[in-house]
Design a protein with these regions (language model features):
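Acidic-aromatic pocket-rim loops
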Residues: 38-68, 78, 205, 236
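Acidic/polar-rich alpha-helix caps and helix-coil junctions
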Residues: 1-43, 89-337
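A short, charged
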Residues: 61-99, 127-130
Length: 337
């Protein structure tokens, strides 16, 4: 029924509505509610603080009124900078899903000032999830760390892509493509066809997926769905469960790891970062910019190298639960025996 009611709402407006506390908006099929109480701790959440662009709280000694400024966003989650290059330039989801700026408290201005070139961004080429933002909320807060923004675990586009996947796996791949492309085109991305499939879904636009065979039309759809669910539901808590459901979590982590370790950033985008990843141009612009292209990832990421297939898809069951639940027969999840 939801699929028959295609919603044509700009993705920026859809996620602005969440931040503005517009409850059960057109995109939502189910929301987990938090108290819209200006960020008081009781029954509040962390959407747009943990997973939004960085925002400094007003200086406590400045006399700035909380009711005229944004609350703090701690920005504990960052985005790998190459991810934005996988989107088409015309895909409006790209600039909604992640941002490259912060709001710093500037004492002389007595205000939170938007900065796109600052140490916090440049030193690690930080990018932040952008679907939930303090700047989209009404000014004012009580507790700087909390918001009343609801979490939507099930929304329209997610269901359309679920239906598309089901059609493909039951032999109706043309209908699967129609539904997947309806999600793409409502965000102004190009519909995938046999003529443009390789240019949109294969290297060098994205990296290739050797663990998904795309020798037939159903396989091409699975490859497209791999990327499309990532583009559409980025940072919504869906990805791990998609990869587990498809049986490719380990493969996907290793493929991403290999790409990270061999990716060279473009001079135009990271001209203010030296070969060690340190900023050469700070907020005041006093230090001249010197750029030397290097491989961005210089450290091993645990998930990419240490993931064990058949084990790490699940967490271990705590011993106390095994001992107290006779139905478990003393058994733990695979790999934790």
């Amino acid at each position: 029924k939801a699929i028959r009611r295609q919603r044509q709402m700009c993705i920026r407006d859809r996620f602005k509505n969440y931040s503005k506390l517009v409850l059960n908006n057109q995109e939502s099929l189910w929301e987990i509610a938090f108290e819209p109480n200006n960020g008081q701790k009781d029954n509040a959440g962390y959407w747009a603080t943990y997973n939004g662009p960085l925002v400094d709280a007003p200086d406590a000694g400045s006399g700035a009124a909380n009711q005229t400024h944004m609350g703090r966003a701690n920005a504990f989650f960052i985005v790998l900078p190459y991810w934005g290059h996988f989107y088409e330039d015309n895909d409006v989801r790209r600039d909604v899903n992640f941002v490259d700026y912060v709001y710093r408290w500037v004492k002389k201005d007595q205000d939170q000032v938007k900065m796109t070139v600052c140490q916090e961004i440049s030193k690690n080429m930080y990018r932040y999830p952008g679907k939930w933002r303090r700047e989209w909320m009404a000014p004012g807060f009580v507790d700087p760390n909390h918001t009343g923004v609801n979490y939507c675990p099930l929304r329209y586009a997610d269901v359309v892509l679920m239906a598309a996947e089901a059609y493909n796996e039951t032999g109706n791949t043309p209908e699967a493509w129609r539904l997947l492309n309806s999600v793409r085109t409502r965000s102004e991305a190009t519909a995938i066809t046999s003529a443009n499939y390789a240019s949109l879904m294969k290297a060098p636009k994205v990296y290739d997926l050797p663990f998904i065979s795309d020798g037939d039309e159903a396989g091409k759809f699975r490859t497209a769905l791999y990327w499309e669910r990532a583009f559409e539901t980025a940072y919504e808590g869906q990805r791990k469960f998609d990869l587990i459901r498809w049986g490719i979590l380990g493969d996907a982590l290793r493929a991403a790891q290999a790409y990270i370790e061999n990716w060279e950033e473009g001079a135009a985008e990271f001209k203010d970062v030296d070969k060690n990843g340190k900023p050469t141009k700070l907020e005041d612009g006093a230090t001249p910019a010197v750029w030397d292209p290097v491989v961005w990832a210089t450290q091993n990421y645990v998930a990419g190298h240490n993931f064990v297939d058949g084990k790490h898809e699940l967490l271990p069951i705590p011993l106390a639960e095994i001992q107290s639940n006779a139905q478990l027969n003393g058994e733990n999840n695979p790999g934790y025996e």
